[in-house]
Regions:
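Conserved N-terminal beta-strand and adjoining loop/helix that marks the start
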Residues: 1-19, 35
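Short, charged/polar surface micro-motifs in flexible loops or helix N-caps
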Residues: 14-19, 27-28, 40, 73-74, ...
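Conserved Nudix-box catalytic region and its N-terminal flanking loop in Nudix hydrolases
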Residues: 18-54, 140-147
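Active-site-adjacent beta-strand/loop module that shapes the phosphate/pyrophosphate-binding cleft
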Residues: 72-92, 121-125, 129
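NUDIX/MutT-family hydrolases
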Residues: 94-126, 144-147
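Conserved hydrophobic/aromatic beta-strand scaffold that supports enzyme active sites
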Residues: 12, 21, 83-85, 103
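A short coil-to-beta-strand element that immediately follows conserved catalytic motifs
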Residues: 59-68
């Protein structure tokens, strides 16, 4: 059976020592995270992250940099989250149906109610020697690996 792949993105928008966070309302994955979403059919990865940040925050980012990935495989399907960072933006900040957006000090993020696994994802965003957060199944259990 061929493998299907779903591509999504997440962007850490930086403004000095502050980062833009989103307090997600989705009960399937609630908590503090970064804006992002699905790559649409025929859309480039870069265009997708620019569009998603704009839709969810009102900010137009430019020159986002790919800094890592999160991925997992289950039942002939792979899910890939592309991690971007951006420090150039324009526009007026506003929240969306995805959740409230606001600026927080980067140093304060570990104290906030982060979405599940967001602490490990944050390491991939920040640590230059990490580029992948991978889930695999071993003996019926999900194992997390930071690479």
């Amino acid at each position: 059976m061929p493998e299907s792949v779903t591509f999504t993105n997440m962007c850490m928008v930086c403004d000095g020592d502050r980062v833009l966070v989103q307090d997600r309302l989705d009960p399937a994955w609630p908590g503090i995270t970064f804006p992002g979403g699905h790559v649409e059919e025929g859309e480039s990865f870069t265009d997708a992250v620019i569009r998603e940040v704009w839709e969810e925050t009102g900010l137009r980012i430019s020159a986002p940099r790919l800094v890592g990935v999160k991925d997992w495989y289950s039942d002939h399907s792979r899910y890939v989250v592309l991690f971007y960072r951006a420090d150039r933006f324009s526009g007026t900040l506003h929240s969306s149906e995805e959740g409230e957006v606001r600026w927080e000090a980067l140093a304060d993020l570990p104290k906030l109610p982060l979405a599940p696994d967001m602490g490990d994802m944050l390491r991939v965003f920040l640590e230059e020697d990490l580029s992948e957060f991978y889930y695999r199944i071993e003996d019926g259990n999900w194992i997390q690996e930071l690479k």
